[in-house]
Amino acid sequence: WKPKSIKDSGNAGWHRDSQYWPFWGNDGLFTAWIALSNVSTSSGPVRFIPGSNHWKDIDGLDFFNKDLISQEKILKDNYGNIKIVDALLSAGQVSIHSSHTYHSSGANLDETPRVGMVVHFCTDRAIRQRVTGSNSTYLDQLKDASISPFIFGGDP
């Protein structure tokens, strides 16, 4: 859900999903972004940097930082001229990216909301890691099929 934005209020900063998932190893995690409405260049599409899933982590990038210009400067300082691709989708289409792909989205300038949903999924290559602190309960929730269902047979 991304309603019409005022300036940068609807921005999602450049980030990798993996930076928010300390309870998983570095492989086999993906995000599916499902468009429930048409997504145009003016509705704040998800934007990707192809190949960035092979980059090292970059300090200073954060989903919650709405200043995309300063974050794009950080990206260019680290990797030079970068290519950014918008995920322009019709309702019902899906965009899938690795948890290590840098992505963001800008403001929705349309009169109607941009509507979508996200599904995070993992392959058999994803390895759970025990963490401490506030994230420590997530692994227990992953064993609960009512919260984190498995779509294939076998033991989680």
What residues fall within each predicted segment?
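Double-stranded beta-helix
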Residues: 39-106
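Short histidine-centered beta-strand/loop micro-motifs
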Residues: 12-16, 22-25, 87-88, 106-110, ...
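Short edge-strand/loop segments of extracellular domains
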Residues: 3, 49-56, 114, 120-126
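Extracellular structured ligand-interaction cores
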Residues: 27-31, 43, 84-86, 114-118
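Conserved double-stranded beta-helix
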Residues: 1-47
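Short capping/connector residues at structural and topological boundaries
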Residues: 6, 19, 26, 35, ...
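Non-heme Fe(II)/2-oxoglutarate
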Residues: 61, 94-96, 100-156
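Short, surface-exposed loop/helix-turn segments at secondary-structure junctions
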Residues: 12-16, 66-81, 111-113, 131-139
